[in-house]
Amino acid sequence: TAIARDDPRIAGWAAAVEALELGAGSDDPELRDPARALGPAEGTALDAVSLGEGGTITLRFEPPLADGDGPDLAVFENGFSASFLELGIVEVSSDGVHFVRFDCASLGTAPVGPFGTLDTAQLAGLAGKYEQGYGTPFDLATLRARPEVQVGVLDLDRVMLVRVVDVQGDGSITDSFGHPIYDPHPTAQTAGFDLDAVAALHA
C-alpha cells in the first residue's frame, strides 16, 4: 500500500547525499541536483533528481532507520500518472560497504516504449510503483534472514544509508527471480528514476 507524503507515520526524511552516479539521459541541469532528493517529498514533477539510465543515488539518514512494526521507509518518485512509471531497486546499508537489496518482482514480459505504461499488479518491491506524492514502502523485517544480517554487517536497527538504483528499463537488469525488468525505454532529458524523496517511518 502506498505511503502518502503527509502520512502521520513519517518520522523524518533523508538528511544528506552520500553518493551520486548519474546515468545516460539525465540531461536537465536542474534535475541533476542531488539536493532535490533531500527533505520532505514535494509530490511535484520538478522537485526531483533524475538518475538517468542505470544511475544510482545513496542517501544518509540521521538518526538511522530502524526496524519497527510495518514498513520502515518509503521511496517517492515523481511519476505524473498511475501507469507511466519509472522503477528503481532499493538497497540499504549500516556501514556504507555492505549493501543489501530488497527482493523485487516484475512480471512484464515485453519491452515498454518511451511513452509506454505499466500494470502495477505485475510489480512488487520496486520503488516508483506509485505516482507522485505517494511512496513505495519497504519493510526492513523482510531482510532478517539475509546472510549480511545474520553475521552482523547489516544492523536492522541502525540502517544509515539507502541506495536507489535505476532499473534501466530495457530488461538488462533482472528482478530477484531472474525476470527482466521493463519500464519506459528509451527516454531522454530526464531518463531513468526521478527521486523526489525517501521517508523514514521508524528511526
Model-identified regions with their sequence ranges:
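A domain-level signal for the mature, folded cores of soluble proteins
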Residues: 1-88, 98-203
